[in-house]
Amino acid sequence: MNNIVNNTTTANVINTSDIATNRNIVLCGVGGQGTVLASKLLAAAAMSKDIPVMSAETIGMAQRGGSVFSHLRMGKNLYSPMIKTGTADLIIGFEPGETVRMLPYLKEHGQVVVSTHAIKPV
């Protein structure tokens, strides 16, 4: 999995000087890791810079450590909060297994930031 992790910063993925280009970010993890909170914080940061934002969360059995993921879209001319497969600029993964599950959303040359700490199912 190391070949999909790019050690560059995310500054070029979330460049606020060019909001004409949409940015698609998928955040994923398991219930209790703060995935939805992180999504809301990123959305609030973008909105504070007058960048249009759309987001959607999917929370499945979250209170029991179930899968949680958020789609966060920034930029102009957004018509849906959902990110199409193969179009995410960035995946932020709080749990490695959930990150692998979201890889189909990543576009070619997209970036992945992932925690190496796996959450064992109970």
Predicted stretch roles:
Residues 2-122:
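Active-site cofactor/cluster-binding pocket
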